[in-house]
């Protein structure tokens, strides 16, 4: 295989691995909203807004207050990071 082909293949593999890593900053407000609320849904939160109820439903929900939802330290950190990005990007509340 010629050197240029090997170099091109190496670059393509490296570039594809970079693209495969989710870049949170490239996410849209909608994607951030969905990811944040997916964390709450998985933990049993009962949604109040029509948008969230439409997207996730309330079947099987247990917790009316987001502060009562049992999240792991990683999940709490991720929710805090998402909220910070939503503020930074000026996402609607």
Tell me what each language-model feature is:
Residues 1-10:
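Bacterial N-terminal signal peptides that target proteins for export
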Residues 8, 14-23:
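C-terminal segment of classical bacterial N-terminal signal peptides
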Residues 13-14, 42:
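Residue-level signal for pocket-adjacent positions within structured domains
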Residues 24-93:
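Post-signal/leader-peptide non-cytosolic segments of secretory proteins
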């Amino acid at each position: 295989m010629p050197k240029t082909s090997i170099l091109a293949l190496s670059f393509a593999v490296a570039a594809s691995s970079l693209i495969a890593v989710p870049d949170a900053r490239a996410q849209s407000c909608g994607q951030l909203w969905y990811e944040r609320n997916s964390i709450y849904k998985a933990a049993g939160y009962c949604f109040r807004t029509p948008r969230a109820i439409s997207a996730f439903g309330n079947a099987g929900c247990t917790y009316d207050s987001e502060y009562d939802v049992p999240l792991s330290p990683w999940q709490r950190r991720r929710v805090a990071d998402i909220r910070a990005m939503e503020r930074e990007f000026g996402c609607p509340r």
